[in-house]
Design a protein with these regions (language model features):
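Major-groove DNA-recognition helix of helix-turn-helix-type DNA-binding domains
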Residues: 17, 22-58, 63-67
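A detector for short, charged/polar N-terminal pre-domain segments
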Residues: 1-13, 70
Length: 72
């Protein structure tokens, strides 16, 4: 399923780590490293599983939008 089709779903849906990685164009390993360092969107730990709320992933991406390179 394409990222565009996934993003049209319920924003409060908890998504898999692999789905979050696909939406953010990152590897699952990168998300794992980010969790250790406290970077990245908030996540939910349910048993051994890690989940992300779709809307929080999108909000996290939107918060990093830059108008030009000097803003970084």
């Amino acid at each position: 399923m394409s990222v565009e089709a996934q993003m049209g779903r319920d924003p409060d849906q908890l998504i898999l780590e692999t789905q979050a990685a696909e939406i953010m164009c990152q590897s699952v390993r990168t998300l794992q490293k980010w969790r250790v360092t406290g970077f990245g969107p908030h996540f939910y730990k349910i048993g051994r599983s890690v989940r992300y709320k779709r809307s929080e992933v999108i909000d996290w991406i939107d918060a990093r939008r830059m108008a030009h390179t000097s803003a970084a």
